[in-house]
């Protein structure tokens, strides 16, 4: 499989003709060769997007017509659901059942924003001045740079592509250089759906060249990035060149608060899913369990008993419950954090090593890992490991639980498990996080905004706020009967 970039309506190789091999993290086998773009390719793509916005018709196309094209993209994704899911599993190692669910969600995102495209027509505002009208309209921002991570390649791309197109923007997308396959395929579907040349451009390549140019270019009006906090900070600095609009989702260290009166079996099951789904490579992973002390020992025993039976393997095998980590480099990072946890005095209750099973030796697998006797000042509690590593703390009261949960630079998501709905709502109201789940973990949908407090990011994706990120607000005032002011006589 040999894949190119998509610039100004044409499939092209990199200017340098360089290529990158994409490997399957399950067995390290090569699955594709893709064009390896550079700053020059990014410049070409930005120029195409700039021309398409300034001189083209997309921004001025009736909103309902743009919505029809975005809806068609969603329909095509549904039609190619299985093909896309297979590519996603090859590229990321996740189970194909996860990938199929992702494709359903992705199609829904495009269809949702297609429906919103003509629902943001603005509003009339009563003018306090006589013989005048006043209205507020929303217009597209312009050229959008979009940079997506490797853990949910197409899902994260959809969260950016769909609202940007629905609002009338043009764009340059840069997916992670190690997981670009499904994004390339969807750009093929853009062509079929009728997206005009230059409106949506795709550049493949590393962040330090392609991503850096998108962040710095004065021809880019907005930069949207999902990824690590350090990279996000660099993007903020680079975007200051022309004071771009910025939308950042920078991950989290998400607390899962378990009260003693919670449904025990549900809480254990949800804690496992929160921590170990997709091998913990989820920005909203419930990597911090904060459990009421009176049930701590019982909860830990149940958690360990369940976690040690998680079946690792090939994402295409029906009995596989979790796949590998994305790369050797990332597994090394996870291993370093496990070593740090042990040095800090946490108790390793499970895992903490690579599996010994012969069939898993070629892949980047790591066993589900649980640390107990953790405190909130430990690095493994405070920093995003982004792997199958769960820390467990205890609390004495609701106030103690809230204080520990909020003791973080992050504020993306969190959960509360209790049968006392009053207590649940009270705790949820005090958590400084963009999403709080009660007696559940992980649900999200296109209609509800997603984003974080504190250093988890700026702005929102999904929901109406997700569309508004890609618009500018303009106030238009009209004097119906203008007279000379005669201020300066």
What are the roles of these predicted feature ranges?
Residues 29-33, 220, 311, 338, ...:
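Conserved C-terminal structural/oligomerization subdomain of aldehyde/semialdehyde dehydrogenase
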Residues 222, 230-375, 438, 485-488:
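ALDH superfamily catalytic-core signature
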